[in-house]
């Protein structure tokens, strides 16, 4: 790994993101595509930008990201978590500010499994009294 490059792994739901940051002009590449092309949804892009906007570092780093699994929302959350970890690897003094915003904590919520005899995880079949 390059001397001035920092790495962070982020996870959310069933998505996992590998984030590499290095000093640059603010280019973000996700799976060999620009962020705007990869995420059509504005909300997903906003989630990705959150840690950088918080620290006013929007144009200080170039980000190279690979992300696998899950959907749009999970991938965006995984990337945010990865960026946060990479920024902490770059400068540990950023941790309290990122922690206060809630970006350091891994969101542990996962999909609940479907149970036998139920239609979904908790949805029971309709009850008929007679």
UniProtKB/Swiss-Prot annotation:
PROSITE patterns: RIBOSOMAL_S9. GO terms for cellular component: cytosolic small ribosomal subunit. Keywords: Ribonucleoprotein, Ribosomal protein. The keyword Ribosomal protein applies. The keyword Nucleotide-binding does not apply. GO terms for molecular function: RNA binding; structural constituent of ribosome. It comes from the Bacteria. GO terms for biological process: translation. Belongs to the universal ribosomal protein uS9 family. This is Small ribosomal subunit protein uS9. It comes from Hamiltonella defensa subsp. Acyrthosiphon pisum (strain 5AT).
């Amino acid at each position: 790994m390059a001397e001035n490059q920092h790495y962070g792994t982020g996870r959310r739901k069933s998505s996992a993101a590998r984030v590499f940051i290095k000093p640059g002009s603010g280019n973000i590449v996700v799976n060999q595509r620009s962020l705007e092309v990869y995420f059509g949804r504005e909300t997903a892009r906003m989630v990705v930008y959150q840690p950088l906007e918080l620290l006013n570092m929007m144009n200080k780093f170039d980000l190279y990201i690979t992300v696998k699994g899950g959907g749009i929302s999970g991938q965006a959350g995984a990337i945010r978590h990865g960026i946060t970890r990479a920024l902490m690897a770059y400068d540990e003094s950023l941790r309290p500010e990122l922690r206060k915003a809630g970006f350091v904590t891994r969101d542990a919520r996962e999909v609940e499994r479907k149970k036998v005899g139920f239609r979904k995880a908790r949805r029971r079949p309709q009850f008929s009294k007679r």
